Every structure is written in structure tokens, then in C-alpha cells.
Amino acid sequence: LRSFVFIERISEVTDVFASERSFAEVSRKIASDAGVADVSGYTDYGRVWLEFRDTVVDDLDPRSTVIVLGDARTNGRDPHEHAFAKIAAAAGRTFWINPEPKLYWNYGDSVMGVYEPYCDGVFECWTTHQLETFVRAVAQPGSVTQAARRRR
């Protein structure tokens, strides 16, 4: 299991989760050491997908599951759909958990609709009930949707 965090840049934090059990300490270490913010402090999904593709995609295989937790807001930057598509194609399953209400998806700078076709499941997740729904769906054997696979 590998874990990554991002804002403008992506950073692997697997070691932080392996060495710390306190949520407060994990949060502190990530905030101070992860190097995820560059200049603006605004999310840059496109840059993140390019970096992830270039550094991690070769480690993905059909047994891999990629889970993204984010609002898909690009702040007007290029979403680099092709990079995300390559990541999703390399993984066995790709899921997206969006903490914003669905009402706000694809509104303003949200590009959820750009990434959704490459995902096996996209979940609105801003309540504990919605989180439970996501966990149940991911835990189901064969939860990969054939429609999502055909679009890749």
C-alpha cells in the first residue's frame, strides 16, 4: 500500500503513515515535510498526474487500485487528461472520492467530467454514510464497471 498527497506537486507519504499512528502527527509531518505546495498553493491536478505518471505508473499493474480523494478543481490549469488516462489504464481499478456535493461538479473550475470516464467509480463523499457506500463498493469483488473499461 502506497500513499501520496498533493496540492501543486505530488509527494509519497507511505513512510509517514508507516511510522506514525497519531492523526495529528501524520498531519503535522505532511504539512511540514511533504513538499506538495510550490508557488501558488492551489491544486494543479494536471501537473500532479504528469508527475505521478512519470514516477509511479510503471509500478501499477492489474492488481493495483488507484483511489483519488479530491475535488477535481484545476484552478484554470490544464487537467492533462491524457496523463490521468494512462494512470487509470495501468491500474486494475481507479476510483475517485469527491468531497464536494455532486451539484458543484463540472461547475466553475471543476473538471470532474474530464476524469470520470477513466474511473471505475466516482463517489460523492462528504458524509460518513457516503464514505460507507464507497467502502462497500470498493470491497465488492468485480466492482469494475465494464462501461468504464470500454472507455479507456
State what each model feature region is.
Residues 1:
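MIDAS-like acidic motif and immediate structural context at the N-terminus
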Residues 6-31:
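Short beta-strand-loop
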Residues 6-8, 71, 99:
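Cofactor-binding loop segments of dinucleotide-utilizing enzymes, especially the Rossmann-like FAD-
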Residues 10, 73-76, 102-103:
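Short acidic, S/G/P-rich loop/turn micro-motifs used as interaction or catalytic elements
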Residues 14-18, 78-79, 107:
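Short, well-ordered secondary-structure micro-motifs
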Residues 25-64, 101, 106-107:
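Von Willebrand factor
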Residues 49-93, 124, 137-145:
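Exposed acidic/Ser/Thr-rich ligand/metal-binding surfaces
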Residues 85-152:
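Von Willebrand factor type A / integrin I
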